[in-house]
């Protein structure tokens, strides 16, 4: 591609709506990285005569980052939604053989091609909202061949679509039926067979575990983290969603990229996360969908300076959500985040939760030229509207990959 000077735009370069430039320009190198950003009046002489692209005064932010999703799976779980409306809890449904395990059955039965086609339909609406980087977890196969299929599909999505895909191995998501009553043996399988094989195939960017009463214990979770450490892989954790089990402190001890959910996080866990630099990933879609009543400790996270990210947590059972903008709205209305916190939560802090701050989440020299162009008059509208298309253009690596009128 050729170098381009994007001009006549309002710039929020670092995901902070309190740090903007009213008349800005972005110089993009031919390799798709940022060369320079700043005031239009300050464009360096070396970029002044580059070919130009006029954005007609639109707002520009970094491309959005969805840092926690379960996008690849078979089937759906609308029947469980009806059960939940009738009064069944998430734990009760899981104990009846529903929940994650029901999706495991559908995923194991699906071909790789079928998994890919279903995931495409879930990914497209996110891309149309300005998402340029996404995390995709495994965890609905729970045996080597099916976990491999899920991670292969995630890689294929990154090859087929203009989005950076970060894969996470979540073999320790639930106990598969064939291991009922033998959780430690299943963790042996995860640590000694599944993770080494998948890592050797280049399918794993990070490792996650569901540490909860209906998931895995602290001791079992630590075994998974140790296996990841032996492979030099970063870790993250589903922690404190349904109870305070101390998972966040364990995650912090292993310097996890993120601890996610966190409704039952306590002060000790917050302090540990702050000390380790672990990002708090909040998932308001799941909170809303399962009608949780315990809010994450937002004020504690603020006081300790723990970075807060937001993500869709797209999954079939507790958050069938394919809108990161609606996630921002929920973060503000349900979790009482500010617009500043919400936008940082889907840009800079979300990139940190992926260990990808050097590539995503901010428009600065050397980073990928991934940005979204918005048809709004103020950035608060990104968290204000829901159900309304706001993204008019997506640029990935300096190339326009989506325009609203091209859909």
Swiss-Prot record:
Broad class of the protein's primary localization: cytoplasm
Keyword Iron: yes
Residues annotated for N-formimidoyl-L-glutamate binding in this entry: 140, 315, 317
Binding site for 4-imidazolone-5-propanoate: 77, 140, 173, 241, 318
Top enzyme class: hydrolase
One GO MF term: zinc ion binding
Subcellular localization, as worded in the UniProt entry: Cytoplasm
Gene Ontology biological process: L-histidine catabolic process to glutamate and formamide; L-histidine catabolic process to glutamate and formate
Gene: hutI
GO cellular-component term (any): cytoplasm
Protein known as: Imidazolonepropionase
Organism: Burkholderia mallei (strain ATCC 23344)
Biological function: Catalyzes the hydrolytic cleavage of the carbon-nitrogen bond in imidazolone-5-propanoate to yield N-formimidoyl-L-glutamate. It is the third step in the universal histidine degradation pathway.
Cofactor(s) this protein requires: Zn(2+); Fe(3+)
EC number(s) per entry: 3.5.2.7
Pathway involvement of the protein, from the record: Amino-acid degradation; L-histidine degradation into L-glutamate; N-formimidoyl-L-glutamate from L-histidine: step 3/3
